[in-house]
Amino acid sequence: MEHLTRIGIVLPYFGKLPNYFPLFLTSCRHNPTINWLVYTDSDQEMDWPENVKVTKTTFDAFRARLQQNFDFPICLDNPYKLCDFKPTYGDTLAEDLTQYDFWGHCDCDLVFGDLRHFLTEEVFQDHLRILCCGHLSLYKNVPEVNRYYRTQPYIDYQNVLQSPGAFSFDEWPGLSECWLRDGMPYYGKLIYDDLTVGVEDFRPINITPGGFIGPYHNEPDESRRFRKMKNILYRWNLGKLERCWVEKGQLRQEETAYVHMQKRKMSYDPDVISGLSFLIVPGAFLPDRELSAAVLQEFAPVSCSMATRIRLLKDGIKVVLAEVKNIGRKGYCSRSAIVNHIKTYWSNTYK
């Protein structure tokens, strides 16, 4: 039997769990060869899968544990600041991760598909880091990778960990940019759907200012293909997640690794959602049903208000201006990437 890379994904979460957290856990359960390590103060009743290891702890106790690893006072006043500490977990939580070949961090506003279908053994053999966003990243569990965040001349990690506010240290333009600059072997293919924030309908690539567009430097053709999809919804069925959309009047379906529903309110009624299959549509989880182009047009209409269009256009201008300044920086951005950004924002604004 082939040896599978052992994976442990860290998820600290303090406060009330999201209303659709049971569906997140269901999607974890259907990835039985991957473990999740959840640190939480929640007493909510949950059907915890065997591959989700729960450590009950308070936010103050978790902060104290992280502090033990640094000889300077860290600033961790609220759970959101944990985003900047994600790249440190291989170092700060090392005792909990010794059994894993790769460790990672994730968010819980996700529904996973079949991760092993996309993250093959060849991917793990050839890379030190898998994916490059805060909602899911995996790292080879070796000292030079676990302490990589301490070694960067581009970013003062002490300043990041000592300061309030968010630095996006876990992704772009934080350590992910450092990996790119240093030519470190990381796997950054667009195997997931990171939904655009602040847009009513589903668009599978997130377009915001501040560097989140960074991963799409890798595959401009793929991101361009995503932008042409309309009437998008998702079907989860027995561990498989499919993106469904309408193209030239026809229903199209394609498997994806996971969908990230950042900053979206999603209604969820556990009494009507089967644990075997369900649909994810803008604003809700629904029971599964037979799909057609007409069904997608009904439940996932293309919708973008004028206020949203104006915001997207402003965000696009900000990012393009920032990227113009980056032309020529080592391993970062090219003129072709600038052109791709302009096309991205134009498409998302006037789609």
PLM features per residue range, with description:
Residues 1-23:
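N-proximal low-complexity "stem/linker" segments adjacent to membrane-targeting elements
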Residues 148-294, 298:
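Catalytic core and acceptor-binding pocket of nucleotide-sugar-dependent glycosyltransferases
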Residues 25-35:
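Short, acidic, metal-binding catalytic loop of nucleotide-sugar glycosyltransferases
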Residues 294-351:
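Boundary detector for helix-to-coil junctions that initiate low-complexity/charged tails
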Residues 11-13, 38-40, 106:
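Short beta-strand/turn micro-motifs composed of small residues
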Residues 86-131:
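GT-A fold catalytic core of metal-dependent nucleotide-sugar glycosyltransferases
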Residues 41, 45-96:
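Active-site-proximal specificity loops/subdomain of glycosyltransferases
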Residues 135-143:
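Short glycine- and hydrophobic/aromatic-rich loop-to-beta-strand nucleating segment
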